[in-house]
């Protein structure tokens, strides 16, 4: 009923964590076996009529079953699968062997797998990357009464941009104008590849637009 109410209110994009491919593994990781069937049922039902992605973080507890977890998630009918190794496993997924059929079904998964195969760093800014976060103008992370630059910033206990109110968009624009991501340790060390690519593209397009106006 919780998800049905969200759908009635207009929510049509769901992201659900899935770090195992069976109930026993899930119990080992979470300590709760009973929640497994509920989570799987929710993913299946929501995927029938909504855009659903599952997020999988690989750690020492599940890294040996990476291929099984990805296939299991794909078979649930989700739109895409977002995989990210825990920090200590960046670019060390030697057991990664996901079929072309599954990769072609899920563009986000394919993007991340290609980055891993090509040895790209998945976290952290490089010297040629944008110093600005265009994502803050297009996305919103909220916890309680406060809004944050992004989910990562919130999880790393960064300071909120401000309170959620009628000034929220204005506050985020001010944050964007005054914030240098290279001077913020959270951004510098934790920004993900996909966010970095977005911000680099945003800066490039923004520069082109300004040139056309001259």
Feature roles, as predicted:
Residues 3-4:
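Short alpha-helix within the catalytic core of nucleotide-sugar-dependent glycosyltransferases
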Residues 7-174, 183, 196-211:
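Radical SAM enzyme [4Fe-4S]-AdoMet core and its adjacent flexible, acidic
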Residues 177-179:
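C-terminal structured domain segments
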Residues 183-189, 193:
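Structured C-terminal cap/extension of enzyme domains
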Residues 214:
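Short, cationic low-complexity segments
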């Amino acid at each position: 009923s919780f998800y049905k109410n969200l759908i009635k209110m207009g929510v049509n994009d769901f992201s659900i964590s899935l770090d195992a491919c069976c109930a026993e593994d899930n119990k080992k990781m979470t300590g709760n076996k009973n929640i497994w069937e509920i989570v799987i049922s929710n993913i299946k039902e929501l995927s029938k009529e909504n855009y659903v992605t599952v997020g999988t973080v690989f750690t020492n507890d599940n890294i040996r079953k990476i291929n099984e977890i990805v296939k299991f998630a794909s078979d649930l009918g989700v739109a895409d699968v977002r995989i990210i190794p825990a920090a200590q496993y960046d670019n060390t997924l030697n057991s990664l062997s996901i079929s072309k059929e599954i990769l072609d079904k899920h563009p986000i998964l394919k993007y991340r797998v290609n980055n891993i195969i090509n040895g790209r760093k998945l976290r952290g800014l490089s010297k040629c990357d944008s110093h600005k976060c265009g994502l803050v103008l297009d996305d919103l992370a909220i916890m309680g009464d406060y809004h944050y630059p992004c989910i990562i910033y919130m999880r790393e206990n960064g300071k909120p941009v401000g309170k959620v109110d009628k000034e929220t968009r204005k506050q985020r624009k001010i944050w964007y104008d005054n914030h240098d991501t290279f001077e913020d340790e959270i951004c510098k060390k934790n920004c993900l590849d996909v966010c970095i690519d977005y911000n680099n593209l945003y800066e490039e397009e923004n520069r082109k637009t300004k040139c056309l106006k001259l």
